From Swiss-Prot:
Name this protein carries in UniProt: Adenylyltransferase and sulfurtransferase uba4
PANTHER family: ADENYLYLTRANSFERASE AND SULFURTRANSFERASE MOCS3, UBIQUITIN-ACTIVATING ENZYME E1
InterPro entries: MOCS3/Uba4 (IPR028885), Rhodanese-like_dom (IPR001763), Rhodanese-like_dom_sf (IPR036873), ThiF/MoeB/HesA (IPR045886), ThiF_NAD_FAD-bd (IPR000594), Ubiquitin-activating_enz (IPR035985)
Family statement drawn from the similarity comment of this UniProt entry: In the N-terminal section; belongs to the HesA/MoeB/ThiF family. UBA4 subfamily.
Function: Plays a central role in 2-thiolation of mcm(5)S(2)U at tRNA wobble positions of cytosolic tRNA(Lys), tRNA(Glu) and tRNA(Gln). Also essential during biosynthesis of the molybdenum cofactor. Acts by mediating the C-terminal thiocarboxylation of sulfur carriers urm1 and mocs2a. Its N-terminus first activates urm1 and mocs2a as acyl-adenylates (-COAMP), then the persulfide sulfur on the catalytic cysteine is transferred to urm1 and mocs2a to form thiocarboxylation (-COSH) of their C-terminus.
Cofactor annotation remark: Binds 1 zinc ion per subunit.
Organism: Aspergillus oryzae (strain ATCC 42149 / RIB 40)
């Protein structure tokens, strides 16, 4: 091992095709020998041979998602000298991304993430070929994109896309490195490795083999809603790059049994490993009984949104069940006299369904906090809810008595950070009978507190 930070940098530089002074020597007829000569005072890494480096330089790797996972993964693969790197993402850089999406810079806020990432990668290593796919991955395009690459990295954060990526990788015979991260935990898997043909039991399992059923739609939490510790997602992205290098440079004899690696920042030990089974005999995509094909994926017959129970937020509620922040403030204005004393006119109940840690950062005046997690965990069937509203059963523990009272018909408006969880909460509250059969307004503030900042209060904290 290197004895100093400087020596360690020399070792990594040799792997990446650079010398200790950050001079690239890729054009040399014997680049591996020259770089190895520069670090002869250190131990030579036995797993990184000349053959390994040549494999890396001829490899074509596709990274789906240029966010918290994709940025560190791309950074280390570019540094390792991977020949071609493709990036797929349709999002633009936001200031709230910068703490964890390490390729992006403040100057690139508003720029497409793939363009921002490639700009940084070229500064790191100008020699690889970088390919930008400036759109979210769609079923009709996935196969046409994937076919040009040797290895796929899933750096996304939603189940529907994960299943799409895995299915397409299996059907095209591409190994897949998949990772996820939320809050202080992460998961990592190498799937479809070795990438045998559909129906071949000796191939590595796919995402459907590990998770044949998606999680309940109302249990899914994004980084924007649940939060993420930057080093956690960075750790998982770096490990994706490491696994990608191992897949690229391995021989058939070196393929390891499939495993699920679980990282928890506040546990000891930090990592746990669970051995995975081989391909499921009835898997919908990689078994002999497969029903998912490239044709069903491309045509839309395999409906990933329906399979995952994901409904676009705009489809959860009717227009009359929603109100924009501007419309809300117009309907319930702050009067001149009340502004002078720092209060507002009598307003309906505002329920903020963010988790308490976010509510404590900032909150609308007179709003109350009922976290969405409490609402979902305590929700009951509609028939039982009607009984609750009539007082024949105990109230859910999270529901204040004055709001649930059968005498109360004051309007209820629900708000969250981005306008997604609030819609789910409105549906749950109506299932509980709190709309009194339509006599009481129970509505969502469209776009959440982000829209509130844009339409009502430009000074509202953004986090």
């Amino acid at each position: 091992m290197a004895r100093t930070v400087r020596d360690a940098a020399w070792v990594l530089g040799a792997i990446a095709g650079r010398d200790g002074r950050d001079n690239y020597t890729l054009a040399s007829p014997h680049p591996i020998s020259e770089n190895t000569h520069r670090v002869t005072h250190e131990r030579i890494i036995p797993d990184v041979t000349r053959s390994s480096q040549l494999k890396l330089r001829s490899a074509k790797v596709l990274i789906v998602g240029a966010g918290g996972l994709g940025c560190p993964a791309a950074q280390y693969l570019a540094g390792a000298g991977v020949g071609t790197l493709g990036l797929v993402d349709g999002d633009t850089v936001e200031s709230s991304n910068l703490h964890r999406q390490v390729l992006h810079r403040s100057k690139n806020v508003g720029k497409l993430k793939v363009d921002s990432a490639i700009e940084s990668l070229r500064d790191l290593n100008p020699h690889p070929t970088y390919i930008a796919h400036r759109a979210h991955l769609a079923p009709q395009d996935a196969a046409d994109i994937f076919k040009n690459y040797d290895l796929i990295l899933d750096c996304t954060d939603n189940p529907a896309t994960r299943y799409l990526i895995s299915d397409t990788a299996v059907l095209l015979g591409k190994p897949l490195v998949s990772a996820s991260a939320l809050r202080t935990e992460g998961q990592l898997m190498v799937l479809n490795n070795p990438p045998r043909s559909v129906g071949d039991k000796t191939g590595g399992p796919c995402y459907r083999c590990v998770f044949p059923r998606p999680p309940p739609a109302n249990s899914i939490m994004s980084c924007a809603d649940g939060g993420i510790l930057g080093p956690v997602v960075g750790t998982m992205g770096v490990l994706q790059a490491l696994e990608a290098i191992k897949v690229i440079t391995a021989t058939d004899e070196e393929v390891k049994p499939p495993s699920l690696h679980i990282f928890s920042a506040y546990s000891s030990p930090l990592f746990r490993t669970i051995k995975l089974r081989s391909r499921r005999p009835n898997c919908a995509v990689c078994s002999g009984e497969a029903s998912v094909t490239l044709e069903t994926v491309k045509s839309g017959s395999t409906d990933y949104v329906f399979f995952c129970g994901s409904v676009g937020p705009e489809k959860l509620l009717l227009p009359e069940e929603r109100i924009s922040p501007r419309e809300y403030r117009t309907k319930y204005p702050v009067t001149a006299s009340s502004e002078a004393i720092g209060t507002v006119t009598k307003e309906p109940t505002i329920i903020d369904v963010r988790e308490k840690v976010q509510f404590d950062i900032c909150s609308l005046e007179n709003s109350i906090n009922i976290p969405i997690s409490s609402i979902l965990s305590s929700a009951t069937k509609t028939a039982q809810n009607n009984e609750v509203a009539n007082g024949s059963n105990p109230l859910p523990p999270w529901l204040p008595a004055d709001i649930a009272s059968s005498d109360s018909i004051d309007p209820i408006y629900v708000v969250c950070r981005l306008g997604n969880d609030s819609q789910i909460a409105v549906k749950r509250l109506k299932e509980l009978g709190l709309d009194r059969g339509g006599e009481r307004v129970v509505a969502d503030i469209r776009g959440g507190l982000r829209a509130w900042r844009e339409q009502v209060d430009p000074e509202w904290p953004e986090y």
